[in-house]
């Protein structure tokens, strides 16, 4: 099913269409979710046993793991924030809205995480396809999200719905991407 048939033409537009490199240039060494949400994400990562080689896309200075994985590659938009990520084994600056390709070989990672940033992806189906490509067979893609956002940079489709709708949006991304068995 074509993307245009599922999402209206305006769905991936954003109020601020200026390059994300401008918006994310200032260092933000802050948490974007509260302590309860941070704890819940850490518990989820522990429950899913994300202990091997993990790629954290749309990352920043903290990756919310309670137990660090063996290898964590943090990929995000701000070099200072990524360098400050003490759990990261390595990091890369990348704007996935400009170029959604991931600079890794097929089947490189045991898991991929995207914490509170899936709503900023203007090309999510391309990103999800790349995630499926770099995951080892059976590896999870854990996309967590909240009700907080930078409203000028989040996609309009996200702003047009509620929390239940947000779950449906992300589930649809998984359903439309080859390589994922099911979204839970």
Where are these regions (language model features)?
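A short SAM/SAH-binding and catalytic strip from SAM-dependent methyltransferases
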Residues: 110-125
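A short glycine-rich, Lys/Arg-flanked "PGG" loop and its adjoining helix->strand segment in the class I
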Residues: 125-140
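Conserved class I S-adenosyl-L-methionine
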Residues: 140-172
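Class I SAM-dependent methyltransferase SAM/SAH-binding core
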Residues: 36, 40-102
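Class I SAM-dependent methyltransferase Rossmann-like catalytic core
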Residues: 2-49
């Amino acid at each position: 099913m074509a993307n245009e048939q599922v999402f209206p033409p305006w769905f991936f537009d954003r109020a601020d269409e200026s390059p994300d490199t401008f918006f994310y240039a200032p260092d933000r060494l802050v948490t974007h979710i509260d302590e309860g949400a941070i704890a819940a994400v850490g518990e989820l990562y522990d429950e899913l046993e994300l202990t091997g080689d993990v790629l954290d896309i749309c990352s920043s200075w903290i990756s919310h793991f309670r137990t660090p994985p063996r290898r964590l590659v943090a990929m995000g938009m701000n070099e200072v924030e990524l360098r400050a990520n003490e759990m990261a084994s390595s990091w890369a600056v990348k704007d996935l809205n400009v170029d959604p390709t991931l600079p890794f070989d097929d089947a490189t990672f045991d898991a991929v995480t995207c914490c509170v940033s899936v709503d900023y992806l203007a090309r999510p189906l391309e990103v999800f396809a790349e995630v499926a490509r770099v995951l080892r067979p059976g590896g999870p893609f854990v996309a967590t999200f909240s009700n907080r956002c930078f409203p000028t940079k989040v996609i309009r489709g996200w702003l047009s719905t509620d929390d239940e709708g947000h779950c449906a949006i992300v589930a649809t991304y998984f359903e439309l991407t080859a390589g994922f068995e099911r979204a839970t």
